[in-house]
Regions:
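Extended serine/threonine-enriched, polar tracts that run as long, contiguous segments within proteins
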Residues: 181, 186-206
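Residue-level detector of short, conserved catalytic/binding motifs and their immediate flanks
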Residues: 165-167, 171, 185-191, 210
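Surface-exposed flexible segments
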Residues: 201-218
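Residues embedded in well-ordered secondary-structure elements
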Residues: 10, 158, 178-180, 201
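A domain-level signal for the mature, folded cores of soluble proteins
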Residues: 23-178, 196, 216-293
Length: 293
């Protein structure tokens, strides 16, 4: 009788334990489900935010060396055009705000980026023997500087940022067979001094200063805020965003070709030049369209 009674008590205790554990388990399951759903919602929100940011300010792409197709073109950017104005203003520093030339000039002056010679053929070379010394740049283009204790100093009003109203850029349009996508990447930039214009209609003469390797300066350009346009005065983009998103408006003046010719070498009139530029632009667009059939 005592054994039966003991067995009955143990059985009842076991049943009570199971019954009491069920709500806790259900609460735990419900809590985990809510947490998982919340995590998914947060992940979705984060992903949406990431996608939106990627659309507005895409991450700089690295161009593979083994692309299936590539066309290199050189463009001239006229900073008096509205599309290119963010590169020019402010002409003189306002507080911490500076324009692109002042920024890269200071980087070159302090040895943070290298400047490379602009050769007569206009083709960039980023070899070690093509690097320019800072004094060479300053002396060649009559930029006033002072030297003290081995350090070169240039006052803000001696930086010729107002005269740099043009840039040459090299861009590569390429097909990446691994991703099946077309992309356009700026690979080199050259600031151009425009000097010699007069009040009698004389045109300014371009003086290309030096080439900059875009991959070398890109990390610095990502720290230079600028206004996207005249209609939005918020500094909501960087110089790197500007070039990565191809926000500039530039006319083709040269392509990579076997003869090394610029368009001016075989286009004798302005109309012939415009026609050739249009042909090259269409050639690039047609290739992309033909690839996708």
């Amino acid at each position: 009788y005592n054994m039966k009674r003991l067995f009955l008590i143990v059985t009842m205790i076991g049943l009570a334990t199971v019954v009491m554990a069920q709500p806790a388990k259900r609460r735990s399951t419900t809590s985990n489900a809510v947490a998982q759903q919340g995590a998914q919602n947060r992940a979705g929100t984060t992903q949406q935010g990431t996608d939106r940011a990627a659309l507005l300010f895409p991450v700089k792409q690295t161009m593979p060396e083994d692309v299936a197709w590539r066309r290199d073109v050189y463009r001239t950017l006229d900073l008096t055009m509205d599309a290119n104005a963010p590169l020019y203003y402010p002409v003189e520093p306002i507080g911490r705000q500076v324009n692109l030339f002042t920024y890269v000039f200071r980087l070159m002056l302090t040895g943070r980026v290298d400047a490379y010679k602009y050769n007569l053929n206009g083709v960039e070379s980023f070899e070690k023997n093509d690097k320019m010394e800072v004094r060479e740049v300053l002396d060649r283009y009559s930029i006033f500087y002072e030297e003290k204790d081995g350090k070169i100093h240039v006052e803000n009003n001696d930086v010729p940022s107002a005269e740099v109203t043009r840039y040459y850029i090299k861009e590569s349009v390429y097909l990446d067979q691994r991703t099946g996508t077309f992309a356009t990447k700026v690979t080199a930039i050259c600031p151009v001094l425009m000097r010699g214009a007069d009040d009698f209609g004389g045109e300014a003469t371009p003086y290309p200063l030096f080439w900059l390797n875009y991959d070398e300066i890109a990390p610095w350009l990502s720290k230079l805020p600028m206004m996207a346009s005249n209609l939005n005065n918020v500094n909501n983009m960087t110089a790197d965003d500007f070039f990565t998103m191809n926000r500039y408006d530039g006319k083709i003046y040269k392509t990579n070709n076997l003869q090394g010719k610029a368009l001016a070498n075989y286009c004798s009139t302005d109309s012939a030049m415009a026609k050739e530029q249009k042909r090259i632009e269409k050639e690039i667009v047609d290739f992309e369209e033909n690839v996708w059939g």
